[in-house]
Amino acid sequence: LAATANARLPRAFWEWQAVIKANESGSYPYTPATNLLFGLDVALEMLLAEGMANVVARHARFGRAARAAADAWGLETYCQNPSAHSAALTAVAVPAGHDADALRALILDRFNMSLGTGLGPLKGKLFRIGHLGYFNELMLMGTLAGVEMGLQLAGIPHEAGGVTAAMQTIV
C-alpha cells in the first residue's frame, strides 16, 4: 500500500486508496466480479466435499495416466526433472519434422477439443494436456482418445494403445 501512495503512474485496478475508502462504509468503488465470487464459492464447496487429499491424489493419478499414454505412443513427455512431473498437465513432444500446433488445430477442428500449446521456444514442438480441476476418469480417457485419433489423422508416427495404457493405470 505504501508504494501506491507515492506512485504517479495512472492506474485503475491497483488504486487501493479508493478501495480502502469505500470499504469503510461496506462498499466497493467499482463493479465487483460477483460471478467470479459465486464460482469460487461453488469450487470451494466441491473441493471441500471431495477433500483436499483426494483432489491432490486424483490429479497425480491422472498425470500418471497421461504419461503412460504418451509412453505407449512412443512420444516423449517434456519435463527437465522426471521425478517432478506436473500433476496439473502433461507436455508431450511431437517428433522432429511435425508441427504440434497443426496437430492441435486438427484436433480442435475434428473433435472440438482444445489442447495447450508449447510456450516460447517450444511452440509447435509440443502440446499440453491439462488434467486438473473439475475433471474425471472418463473426461481424461476422452481427451487421450482424441489425441490418439489426432495423431493418426495427422500422420504423426506413434504406437497405438495409449488410451489402454492410461486406463490400466487408473482402473
Where are these regions (language model features)?
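Active-site C-terminal subdomain of aminotransferase-like
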Residues: 1-72
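Short amphipathic alpha-helical segments
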Residues: 24, 86-90, 125-128
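General structural feature for long, well-ordered alpha-helical segments within catalytic domains
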Residues: 36-39, 43, 55-58, 62-66, ...
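Flexible, glycine/charged-enriched surface loops at secondary-structure junctions
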Residues: 51-58, 72-81, 118-119, 154-164
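Conserved PLP-binding catalytic core of the aspartate aminotransferase-like
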Residues: 76-110
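Short, glycine/charged-rich beta-strand-loop motifs at protein surfaces that mediate ligand recognition
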Residues: 89-94, 115-117, 130-137
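A common structural junction motif
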Residues: 107-115, 148-151
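PLP-dependent enzyme catalytic core of the Aspartate aminotransferase-like
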Residues: 121, 125-171
